[in-house]
């Protein structure tokens, strides 16, 4: 997906599309190079790259830490985890609507799958060793990017930063190495893929008509296009994890798994739920019309 997404952003993106496309390309490429070296090393050590066989024979413990770090370097960029997340807001803002949908719905989830299938599956000992690292980076991502999202006026950028926070919950849940945590992470990935993609589509709809993504430009829009506004509100509530929505199920299971493994980490991560509600509700605040809205359902 690297080259197609690079072309989508670079050719059909916004004014800063070239910068954003190359930033996305370089971050992803550099992370993937280390993983390629790790895959070659696994073949040299084990004589195979067949994942099923590697599960059976296992990988020597003395190599696991280095190999885990090499895979981690790739997955951390693709997730993305703090502090290698800075390419994502730029990519989302400059990408066309279709590009943002693909990025949110598919590409970000590949790293979560990789953590479960390869990091936990091939390097179980190293995964336990580096769990504190994952916890630290995940909690920082959840809190810091949520605070940054609170300050955003651009709807696309707000949703992009919220994606980093949501994926922070995913990595946290995976490395609780608890059934509830991992199941919650899988549900969260599916939920985020659907909900964030829908939000980007909703933003694209109004941007095509109004040529603005500023939250303040859409005051009173519910009186003009009520059907669209209700749909947008439903997806926003799902994104903040309202009980009864898919977002709630994923986050709840992740936090349940985290509380079983590390109480302090779970409490800190819970702050992300409160902050998530704050920045998402800023998208659907009630206000008077701020400009002439000449659009309709």
Question: What is the predicted role of each segment?
Answer:
Residues 3-283, 287:
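Hydrophobic transmembrane alpha-helices and their helix-loop junctions in integral membrane proteins
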Residues 285, 289-297:
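Single conserved hydrophobic/aromatic residue that forms the stacking wall/gate
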